[in-house]
């Protein structure tokens, strides 16, 4: 491990304390302004369809846009992770500005706006082939050691939570 990551002071979850960036040497090497893009074609699976209510609108769903914002931000982050590091989503915000229909091409762009300690904040946009802005928002990801992520969200953590951990 490189020592770039914050320790996990909470001992019980994946939260990272608020406040100023940690000591020198823990900032992710991602330059503000760096971008990653994701090209999407709207399919029926990406339209508004609720489990209990069924199909609602035949347009690109806000929740699909949120997923693509997170994916574009992760695509940016992955290029900068070191061996033994992993990322996990902390927050996503979406403002859906206009519709796009099945068959439409959408470009999702994540742009690094801030790096603070082991947190990456991206401004995200979704635009159609004509350059019309369909949505905007932000994502925040936290970088942690793989072992910590595995201990908190892997199969053993799930078994502990359900009370089925064979270790007792």
PLM region descriptions:
Residues 73-107:
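Hydrophobic beta-strand-centered segment that forms part of the acyl-chain substrate-binding groove
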Residues 1-40:
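N-terminal leader/capping segments at the start of a protein or of a new domain
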Residues 101-102, 111-168:
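HotDog/MaoC-like acyl-thioester-processing domains
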Residues 24-62:
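Catalytic strand-loop segment that frames the active site of acyl-thioester-processing enzymes
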Residues 37-43, 95, 140-142:
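Generic structural detector for well-ordered beta-strands
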Residues 65:
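Hydrophobic (often cysteine-bearing) scaffold residues that line and stabilize catalytic clefts
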Residues 34-38, 88-92, 104-108, 118-120, ...:
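A generic structural signal for short beta-strands and their flanking turns/coil linkers
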């Amino acid at each position: 491990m490189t020592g770039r990551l914050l320790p996990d002071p909470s001992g019980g979850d994946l939260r990272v304390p608020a406040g100023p960036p940690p000591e020198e040497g823990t900032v992710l090497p991602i330059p503000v302004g760096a971008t990653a893009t994701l090209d999407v074609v709207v399919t029926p699976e990406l339209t508004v369809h609720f489990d209990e209510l069924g199909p609602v609108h035949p347009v690109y769903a806000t929740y699909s846009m949120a997923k693509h914002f997170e994916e574009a931000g992760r695509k940016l982050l992955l290029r900068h992770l070191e061996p033994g590091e992993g990322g996990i989503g902390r927050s996503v915000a979406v403002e859906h500005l206009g519709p796009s229909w099945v068959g439409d091409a959408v470009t999702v762009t994540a742009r690094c706006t801030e790096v603070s300690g082991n947190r990456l904040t991206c401004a995200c946009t979704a635009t159609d082939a004509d350059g019309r802005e369909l949505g905007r928002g932000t994502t925040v990801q936290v970088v942690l050691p793989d072992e910590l992520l595995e201990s908190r969200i892997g199969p053993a953590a799930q078994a502990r939570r359900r009370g089925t951990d064979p270790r007792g």
